[in-house]
Amino acid sequence: MLRKFASGLITRAVSTNPAPRVVAVPRRLMADAARPFKVLGLQQIAIGGLDKKTLSSLWVDTFGLTKSGNFRSEKENVDEDIIQLGKGAATVEVDLMQPVDPNKSPKVHEPALNHIGLWVDNLPACVEHLTQQGVRFTPGGIRKGASGFDVTFIHPKGNEKTPLSGAGVLIELVQAPPHIIEALK
């Protein structure tokens, strides 16, 4: 039998002879057994502006990060440079984004910190579980992202049907490839 307290602790009745006792277990330890996926780490941050050259001036020219690619999608109204921070499994992608058309949606430059991306070890199970929990996703489902990984997005705002959201932050869930899963687990 489990009991949940406001403090975040979950207690479990443990049967022993002659009488049962209650053991406090931190919520973070219990969550792994109830969740069919694991968030492994930060995969990316996406920063938007009207001119990605201005963003690149800071991130590439001043900070010395390396451009590793670019991505353009009329449908998603985005033209982005993909910058790398770190190495190996610790690499974080910094996406410098400008809108293809600043008058169309989505407005990838508003807010300037557009979204964060999280590596997950099992994206389909993650989406199924979070959907059952009432998490709102953006339209489009699981699809290939700019870096070639399967992705989906948690909507920044909840609604009546799906009240859980990114609380003002667009969150990209990214299927981690096997070498990232192994390195970060």
Segments predicted by a language model, with ranges:
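Vicinal oxygen chelate
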Residues: L2-R21, V25-R27, A31-R35, I82, ...
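Conserved short beta-strand elements that form part of the metal-binding/catalytic scaffold
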Residues: L65-V108, S147-P178
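Short, solvent-exposed interaction modules
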Residues: P106-V135
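Short, solvent-exposed beta-strand edge segments and adjacent coil->beta transition regions
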Residues: L40-L42, P111-H115, V151
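Core segments of cupin and vicinal oxygen chelate
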Residues: L2, M30-A31, R35-L40, I47-T91, ...
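Residues embedded in well-ordered beta-strands within globular domains across many folds
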Residues: Q43-A46, G117, V174
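Beta-hairpin (beta-strand-turn-beta-strand) motif
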Residues: P99-D101, L118-L123, I142
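Generic domain-boundary/flexible-linker signal
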Residues: S56, S105-K107, L184
